[in-house]
Design a protein with these regions (language model features):
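Short inter-helical turns and helix N-cap capping residues of alpha-solenoid HEAT/ARM repeat scaffolds
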Residues: 149-150, 180-182, 211-214, 240-242, ...
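Conserved hydrophobic register position within alpha-solenoid helical repeats
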Residues: 129, 157, 188, 217-218, ...
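Extracytoplasmic/periplasmic C-terminal soluble domains
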Residues: 182-288
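N-terminal topogenic membrane-targeting module
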Residues: 48-56, 61-148
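Amphipathic alpha-helical scaffolding segments comprising HEAT/armadillo-like alpha-solenoid repeats
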Residues: 111-113, 130-147, 166-177, 197-208, ...
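N-terminal alpha-helical membrane-insertion module
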Residues: 1-84
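Core register positions within helices of long alpha-helical scaffolds
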Residues: 132, 160, 191-194, 220-224, ...
Length: 379
């Protein structure tokens, strides 16, 4: 993912700039001395020629390095690609042909081929690849524990561990969730979500609660956990702050964690509008009617914030009772196009005949037009 040699290139650029500064300094001294008759013309000419020679040498070295670097990396990438394809073929034949793979240690392209197979395959074949990765004793956990490893090298190691999905490597990942570098923290969170299983989910949840990641990153981690997300979501709901609570509520709806639907209901009375909206979205995605919370839904339907009214109108339709029908009828008079749309779709879901009445007799012309439009689309 990252080209190697950037440190040598940075050092070479620094040397070029340093030599140019020396050359310019020598020119300033020589010509200033000549200006005040302190030096003769030969000294000034010698300084000028030395500066020109030094500049030419520095630029030649820099240009040669850039050309050689690109030529070398292009040929190396081609060799690595061929080696990767060769190892991929050998491992595939061993996997489906029932033969043992070549004995380790394996080079870097071989490990990359194993990671690709681990990502593509499921079930028994994937577990066999995991065993081969364990036999290879890959360097990625050791890289993470090395104090002087570069940032790109650590990111590569975290990405490789995420692809390998070996539960025993979680302990090497968790310390990076408290790393001062936010990029490494995010990479560690993604890797931990791919790796954690069983008791490791509890340790991952505790580390995430202390990681200080933004809500979008936390939600991404929960979605990566997929069917393993419930313990982490429960930890967020119990001990999380605003960011963790929002991510947990979003994940409950997107992952269809129906057993946690009861935990969402109290957030309908949340003062924070973002958390309340997340709770409304979660219940709607779960198709979980909030029985006993009708008053809070009606209050949200009258809120000054449009996004809350939209979510409340959608969720009211799940109640399927007369109270919800009357509330959605009134919502057809809302000044917001999106609220009227949500109300009309909710009435269509509950009682198409009632929506047909709204299309004919609703007092608000915009409400009638919306009801007619939704009926035409449903026809």
């Amino acid at each position: 993912m990252w080209r190697r040699g950037e440190r040598l290139y940075a050092l070479l650029v620094f040397l070029v700039v340093f030599l140019e500064a020396l050359a310019l300094g020598g020119l300033v001294v020589a010509f200033s001395g000549r200006l005040f008759n302190l030096f003769g013309y030969p000294v000034a000419y010698r300084a000028l020629f030395q500066a020109l020679a030094l500049t030419g040498l520095a630029l030649s070295c820099l240009s040669a390095y850039i050309l050689l670097y690109h030529a070398y990396t292009a040929s190396k990438e081609l060799r690595d690609r061929r080696a990767y394809e060769d190892w991929l073929t050998r491992f595939t034949q061993a996997l489906f042909g029932g033969e043992p793979p070549p004995p380790p240690p394996w080079p870097r392209p071989a490990l990359e081929a194993l990671l690709s197979l681990r990502e593509m395959l499921k079930g028994e074949f994937s577990e066999r690849i995991a065993e081969w990765l364990r036999q290879a004793n890959p360097p990625w956990p050791r890289i993470l524990k090395t104090r002087f490893a570069s940032r790109p090298l650590r990111l590569e190691a975290l990405e490789a561990l995420a692809q390998a999905r070996l539960p025993e490597t979680l302990e090497a990942i968790l310390p990076y969730l408290s790393h001062p570098d936010s990029v490494l923290r995010l990479a560690a969170a993604r890797a931990g979500a791919r790796v954690a299983q069983g008791e490791g989910l509890g340790r991952l949840a505790e580390a995430l609660l202390q990681a200080g990641l933004p809500r979008g990153a936390l939600l991404e981690v929960l979605l990566l956990l997929e069917e393993r997300a419930a313990p982490v979501v429960e930890a967020f709901l119990s001990r999380g702050g605003r960011e963790e609570l929002w991510a947990a509520l979003e994940a409950i709806g997107r992952l269809k964690l129906v057993p946690l639907g009861e935990r969402v209901l109290p957030f309908l009375d949340q003062a924070d509008p973002e958390l309340k909206a997340a709770a409304l979205r979660a219940l709607y995605r779960l198709r979980y009617p909030p029985q006993g919370y009708e008053g809070l839904l009606l209050a949200a339907l009258k809120d000054e914030r449009e996004f809350l009214r939209v979510h409340a109108a959608r969720l009211l339709a799940l109640l399927g009772n007369e109270l919800a029908q009357r509330a959605l009828w009134k919502a057809l008079s809302d000044p917001s196009f999106y609220v009227r749309r949500a109300a009309a779709e909710g009435l269509l879901q509950m009682n198409k005949g009632f929506l047909a009445q709204a299309a004919e007799r609703h007092p608000d012309p915009f409400g009638r037009a919306m009801a007619q439009q939704v009926l035409r689309e449903a026809a």
